[in-house]
């Protein structure tokens, strides 16, 4: 995988503008992961940081089930009910993805609400191996 960054500002924010992945034989398209437990019940009301952490745990579990991990993530879509609060906690993404040596391209969108009331953060991913 080769990073494509015509400018360096996104690198400072922890993501690449694009990545070229050659020879990928398998792709996994992950549904949005949120801060829910194994029964699908929302967790950590009003705690953006805890919700981001649990959503990342759930993303890792889905990837593991597909025989992949965060190092395989090629693109992220992120939805937050409070973009400023989410950005304050983006160090969590940096720690998780940084430990795998990747900074996948991402889009962050502010939304009025997510599908389940009380959820503040959702992350979806495309992974390739």
Task: Name each model feature, range by range.
Residues 1-57, 61-75, 80-129:
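N-terminal presequence-like segments and the immediate start of the first folded domain
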